[in-house]
Amino acid sequence: MSKQQKILFIDRDGTLIVEPPVDFQVDRLDKLKLEPFVIPSLLSLQDAGYRLVMVTNQDGLGTDSYPQEDFDAPHNMMMEIFESQGVKFDDVLICPHFEKDNCSCRKPKLGLVKEYLQAGKVDFQNSFVIGDRQTDLQLAENMAIRGIQYNPEIMGWKRILKDLTVKARVAEVVRTTKETDIKVFVNLDEQGGNAISTGLGFFDHMLDQIATHGGFQMVCKVEGDLHIDDHHTVEDTALALGQALKEALGDKRGIGRFGFSLPMDECLAQCALDLSGRPYLKFDAQFSREQVGDLSTEMVVHFFRSLTDTLACTLHLSSAGNNDHHIIESLFKAFGRTLRQAIKVEGTELPSSKGVL
């Protein structure tokens, strides 16, 4: 196992399999029962990049009160079921002692997981202990990672899967220079509630087109040196927006990555987008006026160039028509509609054969 892996340290009885309420021992095959949705959830968690390690206390295992052979039959059957369905545990760590034995390996002590901690195998920000008991949460605290208390009613495997794989795709970027003071917030999984104020009415409208057609929420407040011109305001807003979108996308796991759009009004706007991690812009649009509203038409291409720089995307964008207002609006709409396709979550895989975007 390479260093710094996302690892789930998972309890067995009461978390992976049902714990018998009378004697708390799964010592016969007829007592073996999987917790609801555990297999599809573990498969999806594996697909999301998590490694699985089982960590379990088995009181008195190997003694007369809990003979090894009584444990082995249902345990081996459980492992065979998991393996047959594609669920792979990197390790199965078992403490066989009673609490009174005061051993160093019984949860919540660190003996069982000591090797993982000392070898630097654990990604502390993205690893978890999952178990049904307070001792599991205490183990997580002792390991300096987060704990999830399993409960089939309120925190079952479906909920755990959602919490660990569907992360909030939000970001806020504050950018302050001598020319501008900008705050941009985006939420890629919410729509509506856009609040955009740049001091340029037409530019506000264009940014709203990106968010509305992109299917995400944008809050953008800009104070710039408009007494000079609109250059710094437009450029720095684009840089901040691109950075916010990039941060909200995270590692881009599961997204569509690509988008294509050809909307038709009296203008033909074409847009192709690849969230490739590499900035490149090919822009083709001609304007007959110096301004539309309070926005300089020369700043349209500059906006998209600055945006591609911080978003780190490949963008081909063009529009042709007779009305500059409609041409510009079609560019922003087409980009928003294309971005909607590219940021949509379609699965859990990283959309790159290189393993990174």
Curated annotation (Swiss-Prot):
Keyword Hydrolase annotated: yes
First and last residue of the signal peptide: none
Annotated compartments: Cytoplasm
Residues engaged in binding Zn(2+): C95, H97, C103, C105
Chief place of localization: cytoplasm
Cofactor requirement: Mg(2+); Zn(2+)
Active site as annotated: D11 (nucleophile), D13 (proton donor)
A GO BP entry: L-histidine biosynthetic process
EC number(s) on file: 3.1.3.15, 4.2.1.19
Catalytic activities: D-erythro-1-(imidazol-4-yl)glycerol 3-phosphate = 3-(imidazol-4-yl)-2-oxopropyl phosphate + H2O; L-histidinol phosphate + H2O = L-histidinol + phosphate
SUPFAM superfamilies referenced in this protein's UniProt entry, alphabetically: HAD-like, Ribosomal protein S5 domain 2-like
Chain positions covered by the region annotation Histidinol-phosphatase: 1-168
Transmembrane segments: none
Protein's UniProt name: Histidine biosynthesis bifunctional protein HisB
UniProt source species: Vibrio vulnificus (strain CMCP6)
